């Protein structure tokens, strides 16, 4: 549910009130499936610098014309968020249980993402708070609002996200943080002896008293299929095991400090292209939908944790 797929260019250009017009054909099948099968869906994402049409930011929605001013952009922002949230709530009540309101607004050095980000160019950092403000305004009270980002284990980025979330929490605009452990087998080195960076991140964000969602969890074996050796597949399985063991240990349900209410893997099967010509080996099932070693290690972490509790 990204702007690239929901914004209707022709209808928006013809809009009498100058506000954007959405079409929901691309997301209706998934929403309908979830509704019919009692499945909850994460709404991803209301505001992102990526996959938002360039024309959305320009006067008269014409890329040959200048960017609009901040006031106009804010009106477009509100209109878009209102349309998307209200469409889901009216037609699929109770299906979308949370929204990633803003995605990846902070760089690894802790600064705002300014380059190739028209939201920032026009509205500066105010666009983040405004997005949460309007999401809170139109979302039902039981729908949780999240800020979502990757590389959260980096100290400067971790601090910047913490400060942003604290500010939003003080204004009652945020319910949780989505943390994307989208990493390779060796970045960061998440083995049993060296997972302090992510552990520190979890415990730092726990101090905010917000929900923590693990989003886009994956450990990628980079390169072509020749790299998918038994050794690397085992290493991948070990990474999943260690991460799940850490999350179980840190969760408040198990006596830890972190209110971890969701763990989501990034996808289902290897080589199912997220982007065109972009194949990946990072998921729990292979390209033929057969469970990989990491599928079993993912489950084993939970079984081992349960066994350790029963033995006490």
Swiss-Prot record:
The reactions it catalyses are:
Endohydrolysis of (1->4)-beta-D-xylosidic linkages in xylans
SMART domains cross-referenced by the UniProt entry: Glyco_10
EC number(s) of the enzyme? 3.2.1.8
List each copy of the GH10 domain by range: 1-301
Keyword flag Glycoprotein: no
Q: Name one GO biological process term.
A: xylan catabolic process
Q: Can the keyword Chloroplast be found in this entry's annotation?
A: no
Chain coiled-coil ranges? none
Q: Which Gene3D superfamilies match?
A: Glycosidases
Keywords linked to the UniProt accession = Carbohydrate metabolism, Glycosidase, Hydrolase, Polysaccharide degradation, Xylan degradation
| Pathway field | Glycan degradation; xylan degradation
Domain of life, source organism: Bacteria
Q: Please give the family membership noted in the entry.
A: Belongs to the glycosyl hydrolase 10 (cellulase F) family.
Q: What does this protein do?
A: Could be a xylanase.
PANTHER family documented for this protein: ENDO-1,4-BETA-XYLANASE A, GLYCOSYL HYDROLASE
Q: What is this protein called?
A: Putative endo-1,4-beta-xylanase
Q: Which organism is it from?
A: Caldicellulosiruptor saccharolyticus
């Amino acid at each position: 549910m990204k702007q690239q797929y929901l914004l209707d260019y022709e209808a928006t250009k013809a809009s009498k009130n100058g506000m954007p017009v959405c079409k929901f054909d691309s997301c209706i099948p998934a929403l309908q499936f979830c509704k019919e099968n009692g499945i909850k869906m994460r709404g991803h994402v209301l505001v992102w610098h990526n996959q938002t049409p360039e024309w959305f930011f320009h006067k008269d929605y014409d890329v040959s014309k200048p960017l609009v001013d901040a006031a106009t952009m804010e009106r477009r922002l509100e209109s878009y968020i209102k349309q998307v949230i209200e469409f889901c709530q009216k037609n699929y009540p109770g299906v979308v249980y949370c929204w990633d309101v803003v995605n990846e607004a902070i760089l690894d050095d802790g600064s705002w993402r300014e380059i190739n980000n028209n939201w920032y160019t026009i509205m500066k950092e105010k666009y983040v708070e405004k997005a949460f403000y309007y999401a809170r305004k139109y979302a039902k009270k039981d729908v949780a609002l999240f800020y979502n980002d990757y590389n959260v284990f980096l100290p400067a980025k971790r601090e910047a996200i913490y400060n942003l979330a604290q500010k939003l929490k003080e204004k009652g605009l945020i319910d949780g943080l989505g943390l994307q452990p989208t990493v390779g087998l060796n970045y960061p080195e998440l083995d049993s002896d060296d997972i302090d960076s992510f552990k520190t991140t979890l415990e730092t964000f726990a101090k905010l008293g917000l929900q923590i969602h693990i989003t886009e969890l994956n450990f990628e074996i980079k390169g072509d299929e020749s790299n998918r050796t038994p050794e690397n597949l085992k290493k991948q399985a070990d990474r999943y095991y260690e991460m799940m063991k850490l999350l179980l240990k840190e969760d408040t349900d198990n006596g830890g400090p972190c209110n971890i209410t969701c763990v989501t893997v990034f996808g289902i099967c290897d080589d199912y292209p997220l982007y065109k010509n972009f194949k990946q080996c990072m998921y729990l099932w292979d390209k033929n939908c057969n469970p990989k070693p990491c599928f079993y290690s993912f489950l084993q972490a939970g079984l081992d944790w349960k066994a350790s509790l029963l033995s006490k």
